[in-house]
Amino acid sequence: GGGKIYQVRAGLFNDVDVVLEWHPDDRNSARPGTTLANMSAKFRFRGVSSHAAADPERGRSALDAVEAMDHMVNLLREHVPSETRIHYVITNGGLAPNVVPAFAEVYYYARHPSMPVLDDIWSRIVDAAKGAALGTGTTMEFEIVNGVYNVLPNVYLSGLQQKSLERV
């Protein structure tokens, strides 16, 4: 989970070379598996509200910006390594269909086995958001929610941990 991020920020691992972790399961076991590096953020777009039928040309739809970003990121999927996972959900798309929404928000996750590769993919996602804002006449800001490196497993230490767990 993301709890270790707060421990790192507090300096609890400054003098630590190795961390043994164990996740609760239906049995006591230590597996030397890894995880995917993960980045997540909420992208917020702001535009100009107007009535969608009476005065649509005055509007600058924040929802259009979200949809443009989503479309560009969906096109990006073809051009990233196959191990990449990109997920999103529109968390705010306006309140009424007859009003051009002045605010919209989309929440993105991106995952990959390698943080350096994920960093490149993430910058492309952010660029898609910037391009969507530019193309729709809106503004964009984003808030990083989480960022987690992939776990680097140690087979030898996992074996020692497994032996200890078997004694429990």
Residues of each region from the PLM?
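Histidine/acidic-residue-rich, glycine-tolerant segments that coordinate divalent metal ions
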Residues: G1-P101, R111
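Metal-dependent amide/peptide-bond hydrolase catalytic core
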Residues: L63-V168
